[in-house]
Design a protein with these regions (language model features):
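Extracytoplasmic gate region of multi-pass secondary transporters
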Residues: 28-29, 221-275, 331, 335
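Cytoplasmic membrane-interface "Motif A"-like loop-to-helix N-cap segments
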Residues: 73-85, 282-296
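Cytoplasmic helix-loop-helix junction between adjacent transmembrane helices
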Residues: 107-147
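Helix-loop-helix hairpin linking two adjacent transmembrane segments in secondary transporters
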Residues: 142-192
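C-terminal transmembrane helical hairpin of 12-TM major facilitator-type secondary transporters
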Residues: 287-334
Length: 413
């Protein structure tokens, strides 16, 4: 595939992640809408509000971990992405039809299942089309979709909710996801002629082939340390995106319209920092990549501490922006390290394992933050959980660097 064509696929995946994340954050914005809270009897119950994000992430994590090997073995990334887009659009449209909190939680969990394999499929595409020393930038560019999705999602959902009501905003998002998502996948995401998605049929039974892929993924070197970093990274992402709107409106007094743009600003900063991290990865040796987690984790933790203990708006804005910049620079290092170690035929499933387990653990972070807030009486008090996540990033990154450096020295001896 020509240079330009393979990058068209990366850009398409970027925008696919954008619309997926815009769809995910709608619940965080809904939690400041009195009509939505009254409809599902959620007013004043921070723990149950956090549960809406938790059940989504539980479905997401299980799907990323268990469904990805089937998709990688049997469908390939193009057909699997098509199926995923259709399912998550239908489930988004069904969300306001839930007549109770329990039914809404079920729909949210199924939505998580439909979106779970997305990053694994994205990782498969990049491994398919880019050499080992070229993957830092495409990993970073496609991962920009996380920040762009949050940047666009917060003000977009706020606008739709303010002008069309909370229920109609779900339907409009579903239509947007379906039309744009299918167009992106069908026009720009194509497998290589010799990729795993177009190999001759394997005579082995389906379950044997899937289990073989799954087993190869589990045997990826350094998987445990990369997994710890993924858990910490996702804990920060889901914790901050779930509670930042409530922090700005309930604790700092912003209107819903102002909140939409203010909540997006930190993630705008992380767009540039993620690309910077990807460019850096292509210039350093693989064993040096974990140092990004060490310095990035320490800096992010310090900035969140500054958010919690600042009272002037200028300092709060500075620390929020700096925290997301330091967190964003770490983004591309996780898939790049995994692509370095995983077997080519199981790279999607290996990423599915860490992404799935990472989301299963981080699923409880919004709820845990809600419980801390309920006990302390302030939204900002829950940000202590984010500090803990970044300290874990620092420690796991340091351990991973030591092991990779030792392995390099042994290999050279």
């Amino acid at each position: 595939m020509q240079q330009r064509q393979r990058w068209f696929g990366v850009i398409a995946l970027l925008f696919l992640i954008v619309i997926a994340y815009a769809d995910r954050v709608n619940i965080a914005v809904m939690l400041v809408n009195p009509d939505f809270l009254q409809h599902f009897q959620l007013g004043g119950d921070r723990a149950h509000q956090g549960t809406l994000m938790t059940v989504f992430l539980l479905g997401y994590g299980l799907s990323a971990m268990l469904l990805t090997p089937f998709l990688e073995t049997l469908m390939g990334y193009r057909r699997a992405l098509t199926l995923s887009v259709v399912l998550w659009a239908l489930l988004t449209a069904a969300s306001p039809l839930a007549g109770s909190l329990l039914l809404l939680c079920v729909v949210r969990a199924l939505l998580g299942v439909s979106e779970g394999p997305l990053f694994s499929l994205k990782t498969m595409y990049i491994s398919d089309h880019f050499a080992a020393d070229e993957r830092g930038k495409p990993n970073a560019v496609s991962a920009l979709g996380v920040s762009l999705g949050l940047v666009i999602g917060f003000p977009l959902v706020s606008f739709l909710m303010a002008h069309f009501g909370w229920a109609m905003s779900f339907h409009l998002l579903a239509l947007f996801n379906l039309l744009l998502g299918l167009m992106l996948v069908r026009l720009f995401v194509h497998p290589l002629a010799l990729s795993s998605s177009s190999r001759p049929a394997d005579p082995q039974p389906v379950l044997s082939r899937v289990w073989h892929t799954f087993a190869l993924a589990w045997r990826t070197p350094m998987l445990g340390w990369i997994l710890l970093i993924e858990i910490a990274t996702l804990s920060y992402l889901w914790g901050s995106s779930a509670w930042l709107p409530a922090y700005l409106t309930d604790e700092k007094g912003f209107s819903i319209k102002q909140m939409g743009w203010m909540a997006a600003l930190p993630f705008i900063v992380s767009i540039a920092s993620k690309y910077l991290g990807g460019a850096l990865l292509d210039r350093i040796r693989p064993y040096q990549a974990p140092l990004i987690f060490v310095f990035g984790g320490a800096a992010t933790a310090l900035c969140i501490y500054g958010v919690m203990n600042s009272h002037q708006l200028g300092w709060i804005a500075f620390f929020l922006l700096a925290a997301n910049a330091c967190w964003g620079v770490q983004g591309a290092a996780i898939p790049t390290l995994l692509q370095h170690y995983a077997r080519p035929e199981a790279v999607g499933s290996a990423y599915g394992l860490i992404n799935g387990i990472g989301n299963l653990f981080s699923a409880f972070v919004p709820m845990a933050m809600g419980m801390v807030m309920a006990s302390q009486g302030k939204v900002s008090s829950g940000f202590a959980v984010l500090i803990a996540s970044q300290l874990l990033t620092l420690l796991a990154g340091g351990a991973l660097f030591s092991r990779m450096l030792l392995a390099r020295q042994v290999k050279r001896a």
